[in-house]
Amino acid sequence: MSEKNAYAKSGVDVEAGYEVVERIKKHVARTERAGVMGVLGGFGGMFDLSKTGVKEPVLVSGTDGVGTKLMLAIKYDKHDTIGQDCVAMCVNDIIAAGAEPLYFLDYIATGKNNPVKLEEVVSGVAEGCVQAGVALIGGETAEMPGMYGEDDYDLAGFAVGVAEKSQIIDGSKVKEGDILLGLASSGIHSNGYSLVRRVFADYTGKELLPELEGKRLKDVLLEPTRIYVKAALPLIKEELVNGIGHITGGGFIENVPRMFADDLAAEIDEDKVPVLPIFKALEKYGDIKHEEMFEIFNMGVGLMLAVSPENVNRVKDLLDEPVYEIGRIIKKADDSVVIK
């Protein structure tokens, strides 16, 4: 008996793995950008930092996954957008530090290599990379029978970006009186899905809930996370923003205070927050306390900007989308986030 057959009997299909690599090449090619060196399949991805033109480069990295949103992708057998979620979770964190994302690597672990399904996943990763302007320069697909069920997989990513040292956003520039501007989210994004799945556990996903304005539940739940790179980069390069917050797990309460120093607080005008229909549905069907919603979800704001009052109009002019003036920075009294 050959070694190959012995490996196959253990549950690892090497030929399927080769097929996955061939299938994803065309998707990886879509993400090419200046600075990429080498070819897909090398032992390490390479990037020429000098091609960025940054004078005092500081590398900024981020890694994340998509949590149990994956379980809904598996349940509904829809795998072509979950990769965008993975990219978004990484690059949005990097942009919050004032960096331009450069390249991305993905990691997929599965119980059984399904080349068609995994191509769908990577096509979503590639789409996210295109939207973010990053190159997909490497990755790993691990077939792990016994660790995962045959239909199960996990997905994680790693992104690296570069910032001009003088343009790093670390919260130190945020000051009392700054205006908080919100950029709309596309939906739930990629956090809070353990609760989301509990709330809608008995639903098929095909339901047209009245709160969802004609959209099927599963389409709303799997709406991919918005990528904010192309919206935020021009603002960073013009040094128009003092702080950026990526509103992810922990909602407003956990993420907004990460934008500024400990002696400051954010005062949020709840009436100005563009709450999406899905959050109203979650609150209703999940019997979730209203104040807790802001501790879990983005509530319709995926990226928050702290901007000096004199720069607000310029920021709004540069952003080709609705911009929500949802609050301001105040001196801290008790809580770091005050929702009025």
Curated annotation (Swiss-Prot):
Its EC number is 6.3.3.1. Transmembrane segments: none annotated. InterPro entries: PurM-like_C_dom (IPR010918), PurM-like_C_sf (IPR036676), PurM-like_N (IPR016188), PurM-like_N_sf (IPR036921), PurM_cligase (IPR004733). Gene3D superfamilies: PurM-like C-terminal domain, PurM-like, N-terminal domain. GO terms for molecular function: ATP binding; phosphoribosylamine-glycine ligase activity; phosphoribosylformylglycinamidine cyclo-ligase activity. Signal peptide: none annotated. It holds the Pfam family AIRS. GO terms for biological process: 'de novo' IMP biosynthetic process; adenine biosynthetic process. It is an enzyme of class 6 (ligase). Pathway: Purine metabolism; IMP biosynthesis via de novo pathway; 5-amino-1-(5-phospho-D-ribosyl)imidazole from N(2)-formyl-N(1)-(5-phospho-D-ribosyl)glycinamide: step 2/2. It is found in: Cytoplasm. Keywords: ATP-binding, Cytoplasm, Ligase, Nucleotide-binding, Purine biosynthesis. GO terms for cellular component: cytosol. CDD domains: PurM (cd02196). It catalyses: 2-formamido-N(1)-(5-O-phospho-beta-D-ribosyl)acetamidine + ATP = 5-amino-1-(5-phospho-beta-D-ribosyl)imidazole + ADP + phosphate + H(+). Belongs to the AIR synthase family. NCBIfam families: purM (TIGR00878). This is Phosphoribosylformylglycinamidine cyclo-ligase. It comes from Streptococcus pyogenes serotype M6 (strain ATCC BAA-946 / MGAS10394). The gene is purM.
